[in-house]
């Protein structure tokens, strides 16, 4: 019995108990919480459901807990129930209930942990969206790893996810980038407000290879040539580096298209017509304070040009017009102000502000030999995606970027994540999978066939470490669901570390294959089934993170 199944049993039992006493059943929450107690002597799981609803139902918590304990005792999968403290319920599962967890894992295989929480929900997930003026920096790299993992996690809960990259090919930064390319092509220093680094010279040379007479063209034509070829080359490099990192997008949306198509102008006119814009100080302002923003925002400047938010408004309208139920934006730490302004923009169009979610991520720092790594040799100013991958590889880079909450700044110790030891979290998890794969190969080499889980006597798995491992496997579906609901894929990484720890402790305490034995006992078969279930869940979890599950290391 998984925690999810136990929670459902508790809820149904609570409904029956209250209904049988003519008490209000509406006080029972839609989802009942069950947790593993810190002290194993308190049982396999605990819940505070009686304390949570007793007051609303008009009864004493311990009385309700006692009624629930009586009703649960003897039900399938329940070994014992006891009331503790002010009204906690401590539950022990029957041996067969633990075996049921293994059967669920091995019957579902790759599908174990998947659910239908967001079945049918169309999600637009926009992440990275770095300016096309340089390589993907470490902040963008963090979003690449986390965003891709979040997309996989939402899909595991039934969502239809479109991964989108917003290509900022409009605005002043493009002009500075182009002027930097032209200066490099001439052998001159970068403009004061331009971009430096070896990559600028490399792209400038590629522009000249594609268009040898580019520098001889009239100024406007020269600028457009360097813009067209240079921005295209930079964007191709960004896409290539992300692809090599295991991240691909379904849509690359060009900001410039919002202006050339008239989408920005149309959005502004609609807001004028609805009365949500007003004219003051020579500019047009969005009445965003009416929708919870801390100040009104300029959409059309006094010189007649559009402010950046005008493009954001049009872009949000475009997403919603494409049929997305939920638009998630993953932005850097300097974008906190986008949360109220995007929600205000939605409300101004009589749209649902809750259809917009903004996730804010903090910075990433690299540390080597105990000191910060400051400079990229090629970018000249900032560390790139490739710098991290070159140092530690794709798997270690992705896992290290995902395993911590994006709410906090992240320091990545390059020395630590390069180690082949249990100190290195990604090695620790991958090694557990490789060890489990090796165990199954060794069994096969001895002629031992674990057979079907339906034929195994799983009631033999009575050791404390076996129980710990089984219960940890049972937690996985709930972890995936909460990671999707909270938009926190790092929960999956931390769970995998707990699972690897539970497996290593089991392996040290419980011999699976006896040296020299080629005859499998029923206990051997049961333990091989447990090991295969653990391997399967590790593989499933690593897959959601976009990290490989090696069969040998």
UniProtKB/Swiss-Prot annotation:
Its main location: cytoplasm. GO terms for molecular function: arginine-tRNA ligase activity; ATP binding. This is Arginine--tRNA ligase. Monomer. Belongs to the class-I aminoacyl-tRNA synthetase family. Disulfide bonds: none annotated. One of its GO terms (biological process) is arginyl-tRNA aminoacylation. Keywords: Aminoacyl-tRNA synthetase, ATP-binding, Cytoplasm, Ligase, Nucleotide-binding, Protein biosynthesis. Its EC number is 6.1.1.19. CDD domains: Anticodon_Ia_Arg, ArgRS_core. A motif ('HIGH' region) lies at residues 130-140. It comes from the Bacteria. It catalyses: tRNA(Arg) + L-arginine + ATP = L-arginyl-tRNA(Arg) + AMP + diphosphate. GO terms for cellular component: cytoplasm. Pfam families: Arg_tRNA_synt_N (PF03485), DALR_1 (PF05746), tRNA-synt_1d (PF00750). It is found in: Cytoplasm. The keyword Ubl conjugation does not apply.
């Amino acid at each position: 019995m998984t925690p999810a199944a136990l929670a459902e049993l508790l809820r149904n039992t609570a409904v029956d108990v209250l209904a049988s006493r003519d008490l209000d059943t509406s006080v029972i929450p839609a989802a009942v919480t069950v947790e593993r107690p810190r002290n194993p002597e308190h049982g396999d799981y605990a819940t505070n459901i009686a304390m949570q609803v007793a007051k609303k139902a008009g009864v004493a918590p311990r009385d309700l807990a006692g009624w629930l304990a009586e009703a649960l005792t003897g039900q399938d999968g329940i070994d014992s129930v006891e009331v503790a403290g002010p009204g906690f319920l401590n539950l022990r599962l029957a041996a067969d209930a633990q075996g049921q967890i293994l059967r669920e894992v091995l019957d579902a295989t790759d599908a174990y942990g998947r659910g239908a929480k967001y079945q049918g929900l169309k999600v637009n997930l926009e992440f990275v969206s770095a300016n096309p003026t340089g390589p993907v920096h470490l902040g963008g790299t963090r979003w690449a790893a986390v965003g891709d993992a979040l997309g996989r996690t939402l899909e595991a809960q039934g969502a239809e996810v479109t991964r989108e990259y917003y290509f900022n090919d409009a605005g002043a930064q493009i002009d500075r980038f182009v002027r930097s390319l032209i200066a490099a092509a001439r052998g001159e220093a970068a403009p004061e407000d331009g971009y430096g680094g070896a990559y600028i010279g490399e792209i400038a040379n590629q522009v000249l290879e594609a268009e040898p007479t580019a520098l001889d063209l009239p100024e406007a034509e020269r600028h457009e040539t360097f813009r067209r070829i240079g921005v295209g080359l930079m964007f191709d490099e960004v896409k290539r580096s992300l692809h090599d990192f295991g991240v691909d997008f379904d849509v690359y949306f060009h900001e410039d298209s919002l202006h050339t198509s008239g989408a920005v102008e149309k959005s502004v006119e609609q807001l004028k017509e609805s009365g949500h814009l007003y004219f003051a100080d020579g500019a047009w302002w969005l009445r965003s304070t009416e929708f919870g923003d801390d100040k009104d925002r300029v959409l059309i400047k006094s010189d007649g040009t559009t402010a950046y938010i005008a493009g954001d408004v049009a872009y949000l309208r475009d997403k919603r017009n494409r049929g997305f139920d939920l638009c998630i934006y993953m932005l850097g730490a300097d974008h906190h102000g986008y949360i109220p302004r995007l929600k205000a923009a939605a409300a101004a169009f009589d749209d649902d502000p809750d259809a917009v979610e903004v996730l804010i991520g903090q910075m990433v720092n690299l540390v080597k030999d105990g000191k910060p790594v400051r400079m990229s040799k090629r970018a000249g100013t900032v560390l790139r995606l490739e710098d991290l991958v070159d140092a530690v590889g794709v798997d270690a880079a992705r896992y290290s970027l995902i395993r911590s909450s994006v709410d906090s700044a992240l320091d990545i110790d390059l020395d630590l994540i390069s180690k082949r030891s249990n100190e290195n979290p990604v090695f620790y998890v991958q090694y557990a999978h490789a060890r489990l794969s090796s165990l199954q190969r060794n069994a096969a080499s001895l002629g031992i066939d674990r057979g079907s889980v339906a034929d195994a006597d799983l009631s033999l798995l009575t050791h404390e470490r076996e129980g710990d491992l089984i219960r940890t496997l049972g937690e996985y579906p709930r972890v995936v669901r909460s990671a999707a609901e909270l938009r926190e894929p790092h929960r999956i990484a931390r769970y995998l570390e707990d699972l690897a720890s539970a497996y290593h402790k089991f392996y040290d305490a419980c011999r699976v294959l006896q040296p020299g034995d080629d005859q499998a006992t029923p206990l051997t078969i049961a333990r091989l089934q447990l090991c295969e279930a653990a391997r399967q869940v590790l593989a499933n979890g690593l897959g959601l993170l976009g990290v490989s599950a090696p069969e040998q290391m």
